[in-house]
Amino acid sequence: MSIYGENDKQGQYWNEAPGQSWVVNDTAMNERLETILDILFEGLDSNGCNNGLDIGCGAGSTTRHLATIMGNRAKVTGLDISEKLLALARSHPESSGKNFLQADAQSYKFEPEGFELAISRFGVMFFESPFKAFQNIKSAIQKGREMRFVCWAPLLANDFFLSPLNTVVDITGVTFEEPGREPGPLAFSDRTYLSSILKTAGFFSINIDTVETSITTKDSVEKNASLLMEVGMGFRAIKEAAPTDEVLDEIREAFVTDGNKRLQNGLIRYDATIYRVSAMA
């Protein structure tokens, strides 16, 4: 088995150029996802929890937030497949005392029932076998304790993905099909499918709440356009289209124009819809 466990393709992806893009844009993306972070942690009961797990922790902002909520005596582990993102997580001045582990949550041999709480912000949609992954994650959580995560609802309900994607498709003519249930941001956009996976993996008291929210940024329209060239569905379509530099400039300018249309009171805003998922192990 490779160092990426049973998710070799995703391991390579997140440890190469795309992973580096998320390292570079970590601060910018944390700003955009701040409201969603609040939604994830809203009403989370960490009483009596001494060991917490953050699945797909990336550069560690959610891990640090979890540690703050759980208190100084708690032990918090952030797990991710990307060493690039974990290196950034470990370098943060507030990461002292947190454990950051490079591993594949689908196949990693967790200590049985070693955690009393598990959370994730958009970190659980990238498994080759979601059933096996959640079954393995469940084994790491004490019986009767909560797993809480957020994931994306369908593409059409998320402007931050849809708008840049449509722009690239319109300009380049590239064919871009929705990835469906393949590992990726939208893998769990079908809530019935998601619920069935969790039930089959052995979770109970499953609640999937649809939450309408927004992604906002104080960045300039130019800086926002640069980010859209490097992350998200627009970026994926650009990779597929392989446009010339001239066409890339056209795409960037279109992103700037769209940003100006969305700009109000100093904020660029995109409508977003997510699922907030709670399940008991």
Show where each model-derived region lies.
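A short acidic, Gly/Pro-enriched loop at the edge of an enzyme's catalytic core
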Residues: 106-117
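Core SAM-dependent methyltransferase catalytic element
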Residues: 201-204, 225-226, 273-281
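Conserved catalytic/acceptor-binding region of the Class I
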Residues: 131, 146-219
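Short glycine-dipeptide loop
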Residues: 72-73, 141-147
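Class I SAM-dependent methyltransferase SAM/SAH-binding core
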Residues: 51-108, 132
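C-terminal helical/coil "lid" or tail adjacent to the Rossmann-like core of SAM-dependent
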Residues: 2-28, 207-265
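Conserved class I S-adenosyl-L-methionine
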Residues: 1-49, 61-65, 85-88, 92, ...
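A short SAM/SAH-binding and catalytic strip from SAM-dependent methyltransferases
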Residues: 116-131, 153
